[in-house]
């Protein structure tokens, strides 16, 4: 299994592990947990709701290998999800403490994170290596002064974050690298070629730097961190999307980590400048995460879309059966 991270989307080069990164502690990782920072930045971030703590039985379901229906239903959790979906006009996108299941959009009918029901959410979470990383490996890269120190393997509790769905333009997402409270690098996040970006590069750079200086600088818990932003299509607003650890588990995108660690002076801003560069800069995103073996084993000749529809249909039937059983029990009281 690759070593993915939430919005971190990382599979670090072996050479990066020997670079002089600032020591990364458990607290640095916990500070990037969504619920740790969202309230402080909610005015400049996407509308979101947090369900915490997740029932341990549901965590165990996510943790189990394979994509399958839960053996038991989670009516309280499902009702909370439905309530939030209704509040957010019918569509949300999910994440856990750190990660969104961006590597699992292949199983979605829309090839996006857009979810309209609990079954949509469960299917994405169960199909994602990024979510598996949150469950078991979030603290793998932490530094410990003493090898005998107790090492944390998971947070004390897990949370499900549901964020209001917007049809965003991937071309307007950017990743920002902060070293010792100074913005040192900005990278286009979706490594495809968008010709119009070069025409507005200076404007984008100015807006992102102003956003950082006004809303982020000296306001986050860590001195070294990575954050993602989205610039609206009309370029009138910048939205904070996420915070990520400053370390090799976070994808440097158009930079090597050596470049980021040695950067000085005003921040550099890199865009894909040609289709050729785009082809050289990427293989298909999350290609190594696509189509787990059990999908082929379980689908029995179905297409991925048909398998997803069957999963959602069977989950809906299971929930309905559970509701009928509860009603029968109530009638017998």
For each feature predicted by the language model, list its residue ranges.
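Preference for protein termini
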Residues: 1-333
